[in-house]
Amino acid sequence: MDPVDPNIEPWNHPGSQPKTACNRCHCKKCCYHCQVCFITKGLGISYGRKKRRQRRRPSQGGQTHQDPIPKQPSSQPRGDPTGPKE
């Protein structure tokens, strides 16, 4: 272990911070970039607020972009159409 200089704050010690900034990549190398990356990317733990997805509202023109479901013919009863044999 290297000796720790008591005159330097702990967050300024050499090796306390990675040389490159964190990014949004989730590859294996970036997941082990630093402790924060490992927790958020590697383990998937996030304590931030979850973004609520807005529902898409139908347009005010009254038209929906969906075709109506066509009526399907009633199905034929299964089995012998002449009825049960005795």
Swiss-Prot record:
Disulfide bonds: none annotated. Residues 38-48 are annotated as: Core. Residues 1-48 are annotated as: Transactivation. There is a cross-link at residue 71 (Glycyl lysine isopeptide (Lys-Gly) (interchain with G-Cter in ubiquitin)). GO terms for biological process: DNA-templated transcription; positive regulation of transcription elongation by RNA polymerase II; positive regulation of viral transcription; symbiont-mediated perturbation of host chromatin organization; symbiont-mediated suppression of host innate immune response; symbiont-mediated suppression of host translation initiation; symbiont-mediated suppression of host type I interferon-mediated signaling pathway; viral gene expression. The record marks 11 as: Essential for Tat translocation through the endosomal membrane. Keywords: Acetylation, Activator, AIDS, Apoptosis, Host cytoplasm, Host nucleus, Host-virus interaction, Inhibition of host innate immune response by virus, Inhibition of host interferon signaling pathway by virus, Interferon antiviral system evasion, Isopeptide bond, Metal-binding, Methylation, Modulation of host chromatin by virus, Modulation of host PP1 activity by virus, Phosphoprotein, RNA-binding, Secreted, Transcription, Transcription regulation, Ubl conjugation, Viral immunoevasion, Zinc. It is found in: Host nucleus, Host nucleolus; Host cytoplasm; Secreted. The modification N6-acetyllysine is found at residues 28, 50-51. GO terms for molecular function: actinin binding; cyclin binding; metal ion binding; protein domain specific binding; protein serine/threonine phosphatase inhibitor activity; regulatory region RNA binding; RNA-binding transcription regulator activity; trans-activation response element binding. The modification Asymmetric dimethylarginine is found at residues 52-53. Residues 60-77 have a biased composition (Polar residues). Zn(2+) 1 binds at residues 22, 33-34, 37. One of its GO terms (cellular component) is host cell cytoplasm. Its main location: host cell. Residues 1-21, 47-86 are annotated as: Disordered. HAMAP family: HIV_TAT. This truncated variant has a premature stop codon. It may have arose as a consequence of tissue culture passaging. HIV-1 lineages are divided in three main groups, M (for Major), O (for Outlier), and N (for New, or Non-M, Non-O). The vast majority of strains found worldwide belong to the group M. Group O seems to be endemic to and largely confined to Cameroon and neighboring countries in West Central Africa, where these viruses represent a small minority of HIV-1 strains. The group N is represented by a limited number of isolates from Cameroonian persons. The group M is further subdivided in 9 clades or subtypes (A to D, F to H, J and K). Transcriptional activator that increases RNA Pol II processivity, thereby increasing the level of full-length viral transcripts. Recognizes a hairpin structure at the 5'-LTR of the nascent viral mRNAs referred to as the transactivation responsive RNA element (TAR) and recruits the cyclin T1-CDK9 complex (P-TEFb complex) that will in turn hyperphosphorylate the RNA polymerase II to allow efficient elongation. The CDK9 component of P-TEFb and other Tat-activated kinases hyperphosphorylate the C-terminus of RNA Pol II that becomes stabilized and much more processive. Interacts with host CCNT1. Associates with the P-TEFb complex composed at least of Tat, P-TEFb (CDK9 and CCNT1), TAR RNA, RNA Pol II. Recruits the HATs CREBBP, TAF1/TFIID, EP300, PCAF and GCN5L2. Interacts with host KAT5/Tip60; this interaction targets the latter to degradation. Interacts with the host deacetylase SIRT1. Interacts with host capping enzyme RNGTT; this interaction stimulates RNGTT. Binds to host KDR, and to the host integrins ITGAV/ITGB3 and ITGA5/ITGB1. Interacts with host KPNB1/importin beta-1 without previous binding to KPNA1/importin alpha-1. Interacts with EIF2AK2. This is Protein Tat.
